[in-house]
């Protein structure tokens, strides 16, 4: 007589392993995240890639059009303007946010009640809901009655036409992004705590100046953390422009703040051109990936040069 293992007996043996063994507990705790990532990120991304090659308006069935949507993007002045504005924002906002987070972390990494309160104040804008944050800046940037221009007028400085002219409006969006660097500040505060104090004591004994110590000890040891923040900001910063551009300017003035997320929304939900919107999203994936790969390769080559 042959013995067979029934599914019920196999599951009975599997359940104790899942609950008691270390590997089983690791899988048990990571399974919700893996399932959520698969269902909410990976599958929608794959579906989006498929829709990019179709003509789809959510009413009629999708119709295969090949690369027509990508040709339409190349020929669209608005799509080219949106991509250029988005890249300009990234090239200004990402380095500025990284430098701001590093500066605040260096100033506030000491202990004490004052520094603890200052860290909380620096982190506070990060937890404000994006809609409320955008409405607050809509009031601050009012060119006639906003507190920013009133303060500049009291100091005898020029009062830019925020939200009216293209240049000041683009600068205003970069300025808004600088007040939500709390997460980067926290990461760099943790990084500063991981640097052994013995390095600074040895440098002090050798008579090194504060600038030399920062340049030769602190900055090199922070570079991996700063690279992580740079890659994160490349992906996240552009996404975070949607609420601000939707609430404050709706892409204006003169399409200056029609960044890719807002244009995606307009194509999909104003014009119901889901195929073209999906193609634009695929292009944004490719551009973001190229930027990330370029930065990683640049840092890798720099590290090899230093090692040589």
Residue positions per predicted region:
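Short, Lys/Arg-rich, polar N-terminal cytosolic tail immediately upstream
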Residues: 1-20
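A structural signal for multi-pass alpha-helical bundles of membrane permease subunits
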Residues: 22-308
